[in-house]
């Protein structure tokens, strides 16, 4: 295995989903603004383990729309004049008038993914795909963290080490499965729905699907399977009595406003928990009301015609699962009386949501430097900077894994643009502070530069 050291950067991003894509946009626009002023731009590079850009590619279902306004794109809330906005994308694609005539705030999910890919293509010079970060190690000089060395692996087995003054980890969300459930050819997570369905081509027509879950993904999966396989039975299993509608009312939507992040962050812990509890029905285990109506309409029409293929198994849960040679056996308990129903299905799809990926998994031993609160959660500043046990002039930032600190919008698209601007402001402010500092006696000065060079003499944390 060959290890090489490349040039350094002011910012290294781990992951290149919407969060860090928004950061790349903010950095690009910052650099365009400071160039005429003769100030140094921020140098940056993002590393993404996937071979190409993708956003929920397994759930780009026909007619599925995003759940937030198109104005909450990569840039508009931060810079309404941005050339990276969704409106700019529509203009570039020749569809602006058509979209206006469509009279909607909520684009198709497929279209919003294409918008993200359009922006990512414009910033291709800032990202390296098929590259997985395996470790982030602090560089310590005179007891102070002055930079981070980022270890990046590639499919060629080559390992690169890049030095960065700031590292932003946007690890994204990971599909969640109940304890004891393992994915297989017959046991899916909804995140892989489309490619898995394509794999069924050529087999005998499916007879029965089981969909587990009561949220938006579960309802969308149920509707999609009913439409794609009109002769198959689809059993929707969930512990609630029925699908619950999401609260997207005007006052409630204020919980996702940028200013609400300030309010939430500064609130006492008991108030944070209270607010999160009150408003979980904006995002968790809830379904768009129009989709609920569509599913109910389907069940009613099937009762009218006497051919009931959509089977709602409410107040129920899957208590056991066994794979067979050509399918899966699911044992479903009806919770009110404990009765067990055996379902012989071709496939069971768990639409059981996502969990924030652990950002410390890429830190290696550096994870031990992260301070945590009384509940064991990462201690994160308002500017998304991790609180470390060693003082530093370099920043380690985390996005997405901070709902406990920044509120319900932490994992959503709502504040991607504004948060990206906050990150840039924090990193630029740190650079200005460093420039203004005078080194103390015996201390090596730390001068911000466009390219941070590797310093072999620097002592690294073990």
Question: What label would you give each PLM region?
Answer:
Residues 65-98, 263-271:
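Flavin (FAD/FMN) cofactor-binding and adjacent substrate-gating region
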Residues 21, 27, 59-66, 71-78, ...:
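Catalytic cores of transferase enzymes with a strong primary signal for eukaryotic protein kinases
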Residues 1-51, 99-216, 220-462:
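Flavin (primarily FAD) cofactor-binding/catalytic cores of flavoenzymes
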């Amino acid at each position: 295995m060959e290890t090489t050291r490349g040039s350094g950067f002011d910012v290294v991003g781990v992951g290149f989903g919407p969060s860090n894509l928004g950061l790349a946009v903010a950095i690009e626009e910052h650099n365009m603004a400071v160039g005429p002023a003769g100030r140094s731009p921020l140098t940056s590079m993002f590393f993404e383990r996937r071979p190409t850009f993708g956003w929920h590619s397994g759930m780009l279902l026909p007619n599925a729309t995003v759940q937030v306004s198109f104005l909450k794109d990569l840039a508009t809330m931060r810079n309404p004049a941005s050339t990276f906005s969704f409106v700019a994308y529509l203009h570039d694609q020749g569809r602006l008038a058509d979209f206006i005539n469509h009279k909607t705030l909520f684009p198709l999910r497929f279209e919003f993914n294409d918008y993200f890919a359009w922006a990512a293509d414009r910033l291709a010079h800032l990202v390296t795909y098929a590259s997985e970060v395996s470790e982030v190690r602090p560089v310590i000089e005179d007891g102070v963290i002055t930079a981070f060395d980022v270890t990046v692996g590639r499919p060629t087995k080559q390992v690169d080490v890049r030095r960065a003054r700031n590292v932003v980890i946007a690890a994204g969300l990971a599909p969640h499965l109940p304890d004891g459930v393992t994915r297989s050819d017959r046991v899916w997570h909804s995140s892989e729905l489309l490619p898995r369905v394509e794999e069924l081509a050529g087999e005998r027509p499916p007879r029965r699907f089981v969909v587990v879950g009561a949220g938006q993904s579960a309802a969308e999966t149920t509707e999609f399977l009913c439409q794609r396989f009109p002769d198959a039975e689809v059993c929707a299993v969930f512990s609630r009595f029925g699908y619950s509608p999401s609260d997207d009312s005007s006052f409630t939507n204020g919980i996702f406003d940028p200013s609400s992040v300030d309010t939430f962050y500064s609130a006492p812990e008991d108030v944070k928990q209270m607010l999160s509890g009150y408003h979980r029905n904006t995002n968790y285990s809830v379904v768009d009301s129009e989709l609920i109506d569509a599913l109910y309409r389907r069940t009613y029409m099937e009762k009218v015609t006497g051919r009931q293929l959509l089977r709602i198994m409410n107040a129920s849960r899957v208590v056991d699962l066994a794979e067979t040679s050509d399918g899966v056996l699911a044992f479903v308990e009806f919770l009110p009386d404990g009765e067990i129903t055996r379902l012989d299905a071709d496939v069971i799809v768990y639409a059981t949501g996502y969990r924030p990926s652990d950002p410390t998994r890429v830190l290696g031993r550096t994870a031990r430097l992260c301070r945590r609160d009384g509940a064991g959660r990462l201690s994160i500043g308002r500017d998304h900077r991790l609180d470390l046990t060693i003082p530093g002039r370099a920043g380690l930032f985390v996005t997405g894994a901070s709902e406990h600190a920044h509120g319900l919008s932490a994992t959503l698209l709502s504040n991607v643009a504004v948060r990206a601007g906050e990150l840039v402001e924090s990193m630029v402010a740190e650079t200005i502070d460093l420039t203004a500092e005078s080194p103390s006696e015996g201390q090596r000065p730390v001068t911000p530069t466009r390219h941070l060079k590797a310093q072999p003499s620097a002592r690294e944390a073990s």
